[in-house]
Amino acid sequence: MKEVALGTVNNWCKGVIVWNLMLDNDRAPNREGGCQTCYGAVDISNSDYKTIIRNSHYYIIAHLSSVVKPGAVRIGASGYADSNIMYSAFENPDGTYAFVLMNNNEKTKKITLSDGKRHFAYDVPGKSVTSYRWAKSE
């Protein structure tokens, strides 16, 4: 999450590509001389082609796509000054806000999100990622 998603969009990237959606458990297919350490968002077992293993990129796609919609723009967010907390905020075309936060601390951290008119608090478990989406206050 840190390098692939939040780190890139926080540095003005307009999109994130997860190149390999599905590979087998030998990280194939691949080309000679190609990446030997790349993996798919999901791996499928080449013994039965039914068993699926969800890797970290699967969860990155799930978190972001659940709240950040096509055409969204990243907006400013400020607050938490903990080096083990990373987050990004977005405004979706339908006017909703999206917020994705990674807590890389061992312990739960209490956060408060505010859009300027209302706020809510949440306890973010240690070593977790949380995604939020809410309608703008009128």
Question: Where in the sequence are the language-model features?
Answer:
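Substrate-binding and catalytic surfaces of secreted/luminal carbohydrate-active proteins
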Residues: 1-138
